[in-house]
Every structure is written in C-alpha cells, then in structure tokens.
Swiss-Prot record:
Induction: Up-regulated by Pseudomonas aeruginosa, PAO1 strain and PA14 strain infection and down-regulated by phagocytic stimuli. It comes from Dictyostelium discoideum (Social amoeba). Residues 585-816 form the Ras-GEF domain. Pfam families: RasGEF, RasGEF_N. Residues 223-255 form the LisH domain. The lineage of its organism: Eukaryota, Amoebozoa, Evosea, Eumycetozoa, Dictyostelia. The gene is gefI. This is Ras guanine nucleotide exchange factor I. GO terms for cellular component: plasma membrane. Residues 117-128 have a biased composition (Gly residues). Residues 8-41, 104-116, 136-167, 343-354 have a biased composition (Low complexity). One of its GO terms (biological process) is Ras protein signal transduction. Residues 426-551 form the N-terminal Ras-GEF domain. Residues 331-341 have a biased composition (Basic and acidic residues). Residues 1-51, 65-167, 330-354, 398-425 are annotated as: Disordered.
Amino acid sequence: MSNPVCISNSTNGSSNSLNGESVSPNRLGSSPGSPISKASSFDLNGKKPTKSNVVRLLLNRTNSGSNLLSKRRTSETGDDDSNSSVGLLNNSTGSIGKMNTPESSPKSSYILSSSIGSGGSGGGGGSSGSLQNLDSASNNSSGPRSRSGSLGKNNSSQQNNNNLILDPNFNNIDKSLWTVRSLKEHSNLVDIMERIKPASRAISFGQIYASEETQFEFDPVIGRDNILQLILQHLQFEGLMDSRKILEEEAKIQYPEYTFNESRLVTLLRAVIKDSDKVFDLTLNDRDKDSQQKLEEHLAFLGLFKDESQTNMVEDVNIYDEPENSNIIYVDEKDNDKPSKDSPTTATTTTTATTIAPSTSINNLSSLSVSISSNNINNNNNNNNNINNLNSTQLISNTQQQQATPNTPPQGLKSTQSITGSTGTLGPQVKAASLNKLVILLTPENNHDLEYTKTFLLMYQSFTTPEILLQKLIQRYHVPQKAGQSVAEWRQRSTHIQLRVLNVLKTWIKDYFSDFSEKLILAIKSLLESMRQTGNMSYAKVISDALNSGLKKSGRNNTVFTVSAPEPKVPKNIWSHNLDIFSVDEEEISRQLTLMDFEIFSNIKSTELLNQCWNKPKLRHRSPNVLELIGRFNEISQWTATSILSWPKVKDRARIMGKFIKIAEYCMKHLNNFNTSMAILSGLNASSVHRLKFTKEELPRHTQQVYTELQFHLSSAQAYKEYRALLAKANPPCLPYLGVYLTDLTFFEEGNPDFIQGFINFGKRKLIYGSISNVQSFQNTKYNLQPVYQIAKLLKGFKLLEENELYTRSMSFEPRNKERSEIL
C-alpha cells in the first residue's frame, strides 16, 4: 500500500485535509512525513498537544471503522468552508430522510431505529458502509469507485500474495527485523500500526496526558465550529429547538439540518469514556512474540540496535586493489594472544598459497577434466581454451568423521592454535583475514587445498552473503595486467586463477545449490554470456552444465537401495479404527519414529546451524528444521510421561514404562537412533515420572537393567563422554542426538570472537565446520525402512498433558510416605 489509508464519507472522492495535505484522522503525527507534524511527533502547528487531541482521535473511531468526522457542509448549496479542515454530522450510516417539521424531535421519531442505520446508499454525503468509504478514500484522486471494483482489486492483491508464498526463493529472503525495515521504508504502515495498536504509542499518550489542558475552541484540528455543530445536532435530536435557535444567534452560526437517528455528541462521548478507560487494551495480542524480539525491534526502529549481520562490515574494496602484504594474520607457534595492531604482517598471500602442501584427501577425489587441447596447465603451457582439474567436492569419509567427533568437552580456540587435522594440514595457516584475502586463498594461483574450499563454502554465510561472494569471485576471475608484466605472463597467470575460480564456482553450485536465488542464477548466466563472447566456450559449458544439473536435481531424493526394506511388523487390527499405538510391536514403533525424525534431520541445512539462529528470536526463521526437530524431541519426551501417567494402577504404569524402555533400547542398539532414544529417556527422567518408585520396582529385572544401560550410555556426564564414544563406533545410517551439536556450536560461537583486529576469525569457522560437517555426514545415508501410514498417523497425534497436570497425577497415584500396600 503506497498511499495512507484515509477514510472519508464524501462522495466526490475528497479526503480529510489539513492545509491541503491528506490527514489520517486517527493519527497522532508520529509517523515520518506526517502533515500534522514534520519536526516533532507532538507539535501541532506550533501549538502544544493536549488531552483534547486524544479525545478528538477517539471521537473519530467507531466499531465499524468508519470516519465520523467528514468534511462539513456549511450551506444547502454544498459550499465548503476552507477554514475548517474536518467537518461533522455527515451521515456515514446511510441517509434515512429529512424531517419535514424541524420543530419535531428526531429522538421520538427514530427511537426504534437502529443506531447503525439501514445500510442503504445515502444521498449526498451518505455512505453505504465502511467498505465503500475505504474504497473511495483510497482512490480519491480518481473519484469514487464501486464496491465491485474494490473487491476485484483485493482479489488481485490476494493472488499476488499467493504467488509470493509459492515462490521457491521465498524462504531464502532475509526476514530478520522485517517489521523495522517495513516501517522505515513505508511510512504509511506506521500510520496503520498506530491506529490498530495504540499501545505502541505509550510515550505519546503519556506526554499528552501529562500536558496542560486547553479549550476545544483553540484546538487546531477540531476547532470551535465543529464542537458547536455537535451541540446543535444534539439539541435538534432532543427536540430543544428554542435552545438551538438561541445558540445559533449567540454563536452567529447556522445549523444545516441533517437527519440522524442518534445524538452524535452522546455517542461519541460514550466512545471516549469507554476507550479512555481501556486505551491500552486496544492492542493486538503479542504473546506470540518473544520479549527479546520485541525489545530488539523497538531499539532497531529507534536506530539504537545494530543487526549482527551488519556488524563489522567494512567498505567494499576490489579484490585486486587491496594491498598484498596486509589484512591477513597467520597462525604461528610463537604467536601472542594479543598481537600489536601497529605491527604489519609481512607475509604475502601468494607466498602462503604456494608454500603450503595440499590436503592428502585430494587423491581420493574424482576430477573432471575438459581437454580443449593437448597442452596441460600444470606444465605451464599457455592456452586460454584449456580447463584442467575442475575438481568436484566430495564429503569427508566416515572414518574422518569418526575421528573428528570429539570425545572431550569442546575447547575454545586460542590465538596460538593451528588449523590442522588428523590427515595433515587442512588449509592455509591463517587465523584471520579480510574477505578479499580469504577469497584469494580460496582461488590460489598454484596449489589448491580442497579442505579449505569445503570449510569456506560451508561457513561463508557466517561472515558474508552469497551475493557478495559471487561478486568477489567475478572480481577474481577478471585478472588485471600488472605494470611491467608481459602479455604471456599475464595470460598464464590469469588462466591459472580463472580455472580456480571456475572450479570453486562449480563446486559451490554442485554442493550448495540451495544458496542460489533467482537473482544469483541470473548473475551467473550473465557471467557465462560474457565468457562465451570472449571465446571461452568450454569454460562456460562446464559451469552451465553444473547449473542445469542443480536445477534438475533441486528438490529430488535420488537415494536408491539395493536391498529391500525389512517387512513391517504390523498388528492384525492395522485397518481397524480402534488401532492403539500400544498394540503395535516395540520394534515397529521404533522404526516409524526413526523414519519420521530422520526426515526432519535430513532436511537441516548447514546455514541453519550458523550464528546460533535456532536460539535467537530474530534469526529463528533461518532454522525451521532445527526448531522442528527440537519440537519433535520435546513432544516425544512429553508423550512418554503422559502415556505412563495415564494409568492409575502401578502394574499398568509399569507395563507402559517397560514398553518405552524397549523402544529406546531398540532405537539405540539396532537403529543407531540416539536422538529418539534420548527423547524417550528425557521423558522417563521427568520429575513426574522419575519419582514413581513403586512403578520402577514393578518392572522386570531385565527391563530395569536395560534402563540402567540407557542412563549410562546417554548420560550428559563429562560432556556426553560415553555417548560420543558410542557415536564414533556407530555405522550409518545414524541419527545422532542434535542437542550435543547445538551445545558444541554454542560453545564455539560464544567462546571465540567473530573478528580479530577487524579481520574475519577463520579459525573459529574451522571449529564450527567440524561440527556441521559431522551433521552433514550423517544426513547422507538414509534408513532403508518401510513407512506404515496407519502407525505413523498415530505417532503424529499425541495427546499431551501439561507439566503441572503430570505432577499432580504423579502425586495422586503415588503419594509421599505411602507403603506399596496402600497404592493401587
């Protein structure tokens, strides 16, 4: 909506105005560009705001949302009074007809009429309803429109909104602080927000109520004439014609006889009394908003809050304009914790890139070679049409993943820590650097470290955006010729760098195609077109094929099992509408729970685990699958406790508790599903269930022993030491407990700064990469199990009890200081 909504009852399409400007009658002038006040939210034409302003605003609102103060007619000919911007007594509820005898009382004639009106189309300034008023007011430049036109417009708008929701790139749009950005970009939204949510103007209300009272006749908006018109209409309605005539003579004003079925003065005063008592109750329900989120939005709107994504952002510099011997900090064994800011770094980027050894894992990777000629780039033969070793990225092997799984509590990165791994150097010995330097290390002229590439592509969204990264790669691709450099040397150097850029771009598209919005894809196509025009057809073909492959595979699941899934263990009454989940075998319940939870786990994207998105109100929209899996975990835990405490007898509770213990055991030992096992164990350890002493004693000895083993292996002692050891030995498919990774990521995020001396802390990103890459490795191998719709449906519709109700039942079933013989 590009124009402010202005509700008017006049038929000529004119709106309320103040000195020729459009005015919203319910506005306090706090929105930017307000015609009531441009310099200050509380300055009304140089006069001090008063309580009468609040009264006026409340007078202008009815239950239907129509404006009761429309443009006033001062004579029967319809001439407007230019000195009065807001008029009264224009029938917004429909014209009923004018009284033939002025001396008669409209009150007695229309005592049985509805105060809302007949809803017919009134003549002149009448209106058939608030929809028509809204339509004519919002289109006052072109005259009034019919209802059908307004509804048609709304349908078109609704269709556009549906298209927006169906847009595949909708979820890629940054929605953090969207309220603040919308209000700043569209000032008319502020006006609408103030109408429907007056509590957001608490400061404005407080200052107005605390101000001194002034008389209505000095009010710059309502004015003396409008108040007199209200009084005259009230006298007319009550049949006090003599009093009306005396007032007209004294005030030297003539009352144009309008026909109303109510006293507008009384009606509006009633609204004032009702609304003034509950002025802060006229708000929308904000209970769905986190208090921290509301605080951040409020601070951001005032310009006092800095978005983390914008923190430490420096002015962009072309990648070749940045000095080679600066903006990078290397890891050194003798590195101090706090290096001096004044000591420049002397090592150049080129030296670093050529002296490090490539990762040993490169030999295990498949490569794509597009031979354009018989020459090879590694032999330093110059050929612009040759592409060599466009390596495709391969995920870390399971052995490496198991070695990377920590068996001890995560430790924070120190400034003296080297970025190395079990298989040798994983990347350049860089602790921190500028974005340009990191991109140069990503596309070196000679040696190329694939592990560094995987780390960068997985973690880059924690310090930049896909748009900026693509821009930097394009800058890197266009290699300038240095002063004094021969054409042959320049071509040889540019060919090496361009091949690296294309290699990174191909890997990026292949492994992280979800990062590419429609805008980015168009930018890549533009780059490919420029490559074709310069004769690099083969270069363009490799990237084009990768792009087309990503578009075809988007949203597909290409997993193919060579072995058939085990036959489901379904009960005989599987087709019965009385099917009970506890009549299903524990093994099959474990399988269906595993399938449902793994589907959510496999959908988690690497970006959902960056910057603690799942734990920050304004960033939670970036982690939908993480939050869904967390919610599912809590749901299973609550379901476990609810199911056990649904039975008043000890033997029944023991039977259900034993069933859950068997489900957790099968998930952990046979399916490597530690997440669901942990959720069930969490329900068993809930305070309402844990205290059920007699129920646990009723369990068979073998079941009690299994319960003890679960407690041992899934214990949180020593940062889940036993669980980490068990996970390292597990073979895929596997569903790890997500909570451990979230804990580690939180430790890495909060224990290490994002920037060191203003440069991106890449060492921190390497630590985070280790945890996220582990999650990705478990996502690759899916479970070969057969889903059973009837059982899965039962496992989705849990009936859960609140914590208070659970504990109340627990105390009722097994009271304190009671003997076993005293309990059912």
